[in-house]
């Protein structure tokens, strides 16, 4: 055993000793919840100040021809940023080799770095670099893996739901930050909204270095390996290599087989069509702040009302997302999917109406939160639950992965569509055009 391995073993043994302390688990859940909050803030911060960012970087005013062209062009370029997802599976696999703790820390600090680069930018190029960094680190969700590997089996789903609900509700902070820190006469103040999320990302990421231990599952597996002799390690590596080769041979062409299965079976073909339409219909979630700004620009909404919407909708989203999970268990998949689709459609209709007519901002905020709660709940159901239950065991993982790939295609289309709408119809027409386009898809 090398000196490096001895140090690693000592560290892992100390971590193992912590796993049985009740107070450590409670403390760990608190840290993981804050990481989840950072994740949600990073995911939503760009959308919360989208119009201010464009006005600042392109030196234009909301609703002008220059703004519409700039917003559309930036949207098309930003769509290309999502190509970074192509290397995401390879990055995620490193957590199996080097441990969850390291990547919990890297992802959390990485989100902070992405946001920091974005606010330091005074040109579009550097801003896009920040967007790419944020986009890369957001979807990894190591905090969820931590909960699944550290929590007792009977409490895992409950803890995942609670931490997710808290994180969703925390997005209301962005509305508060817009109210406190953004000066509408100085669009460059959008950067102030990022400051607290950046600080939170760095503080909790650095704190995790000293306070978070490796997960019990990885610790046990790694200690077993370190305690092996050289001969045992060599034998284990040969066995694992043989298993990988056998699995590779077994699954050769598995993606093609999955697509073949999807489009040769009535049930999965229908799911695939719904999955693409659903992904396409999520397009309005990327333009909600612009839809709200249209209300201000046309004089049907005050700045205070818009900030109320931004602060209120996350509470509704968090509450109804939790309710949607319980409803699925009680009513079953099909009934729940129909109800959740109705939530999304009705919510979008009322939200769009609230952006064009003078109604109570709490109603408008409720409608948007209600809509996206239904949308994301049905998304999880379609891509994971229903797809998984409709595929045979031997290709189930490949079918689920292929269905998610189809969803990404739908998402790419909606981003391009949104950008073209912005360039052709203009910002002032967004509430009408997006609602007329996306609402019928939800009904279908």
Write out the residue ranges for each language-model feature.
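Extracytoplasmic gate region of multi-pass secondary transporters
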Residues: 46-48, 265-321, 411-415
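Central cavity-lining transmembrane alpha-helices of secondary-active solute carriers
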Residues: 75-93, 140-143, 311-324
């Amino acid at each position: 055993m090398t000196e490096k391995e001895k140090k690693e073993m000592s560290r892992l043994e100390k971590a193992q000793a912590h796993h049985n302390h009740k107070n450590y688990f409670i403390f760990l859940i608190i840290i993981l919840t804050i990481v989840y909050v950072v994740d949600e803030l990073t995911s939503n911060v760009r959308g919360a100040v989208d119009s201010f960012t464009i006005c600042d970087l392109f030196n234009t005013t909301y609703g002008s021809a220059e703004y519409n062209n700039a917003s559309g062009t930036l949207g098309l370029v930003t769509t290309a940023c999502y190509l970074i997802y192509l290397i995401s599976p390879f990055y995620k696999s490193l957590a199996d080799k080097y441990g969850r703790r390291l990547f919990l820390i890297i992802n959390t600090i990485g989100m902070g770095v992405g946001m920091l680069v974005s606010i330091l930018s005074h040109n579009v190029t550097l801003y896009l670099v920040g967007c790419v960094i944020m986009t890369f680190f957001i979807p990894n969700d190591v905090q969820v893996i931590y909960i699944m590997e550290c929590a007792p089996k009977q409490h895992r789903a409950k803890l995942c739901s609670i931490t997710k609900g808290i994180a969703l509700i925390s997005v209301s902070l962005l509305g508060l930050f817009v109210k406190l820190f953004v000066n509408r006469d100085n669009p460059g103040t959008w950067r102030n909204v990022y400051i607290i999320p950046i600080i939170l990302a760095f503080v909790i990421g650095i704190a995790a270095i000293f306070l978070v231990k490796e997960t019990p599952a990885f610790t046990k597996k790694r200690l077993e390996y370190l305690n092996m002799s050289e001969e045992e390690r060599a034998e284990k590596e040969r066995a694992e290599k043989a298993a990988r080769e056998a699995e590779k041979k077994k699954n050769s062409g598995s993606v093609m087989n999955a697509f073949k299965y999807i489009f040769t079976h009535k049930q999965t073909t229908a799911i695939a069509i719904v999955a693409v339409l659903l992904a396409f219909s999520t397009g309005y979630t990327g333009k909600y702040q612009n839809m709200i700004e249209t209300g201000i620009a046309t004089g049907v909404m005050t700045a205070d009302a818009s900030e109320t919407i931004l602060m209120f909708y996350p509470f509704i989203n968090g509450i109804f997302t939790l309710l949607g999970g319980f409803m699925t268990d009680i009513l079953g998949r099909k009934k729940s999917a129909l109800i959740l689709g109705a939530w999304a459609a009705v919510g979008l209709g009322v939200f769009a109406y609230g952006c064009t007519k003078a109604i109570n901002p709490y109603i408008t905020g409720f409608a948007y939160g209600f809509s996206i709660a239904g949308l994301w709940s049905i998304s999880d159901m379609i891509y994971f639950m229903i797809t998984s239950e409709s595929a045979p065991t031997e290709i189930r993982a490949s079918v689920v992965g292929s269905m998610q790939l189809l969803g990404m295609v739908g998402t790419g289309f909606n981003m391009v569509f949104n950008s073209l709408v912005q360039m052709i119809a203009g910002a002032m027409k967004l509430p009408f055009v997006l609602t007329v386009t996306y609402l019928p898809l939800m009904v279908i």
